[in-house]
């Protein structure tokens, strides 16, 4: 990430310490925690002592740095999740891993066309949506947008009568339209009407 920010490994270790000390999420209490990582932000530069993988010179430097940083952040998240699994309250806990935007941003077009990145780097802007300890085990391969995450989580939490159900559609809804609007107002997917597109773009803004 950018300079002078707490690394994800240190960040999650500090979060774990606060839970262990009872400063946050005490046993027997319900809690909502939102933990925001930063190491995986451009320009994707990690100190040498934190780099656990390396790539040949065939891989563009920016692409290699991105994957090295992704490895670091993934490991930090993984260690924290494994810790959460040891807690008594884990059985009633939903862990959601997502992002506010896709990773490569302005680097994507360049890497898509590079000899080392072509065929590896997608020209699509993907953002992860991973639910750990979900009451429903599934993999969703169709198109969905960030707007669809909130109503999906309401479904998983069985909050179908919640006072605000969001602007998107739950992926558990068999009638969900398989499309999404990107940050550049580009539309991905199919099976939607002009009215659906207009609504999604308005909701994005």
List PLM regions with ranges.
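Solvent-exposed soluble domains appended to multi-pass membrane proteins
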Residues: 1-205
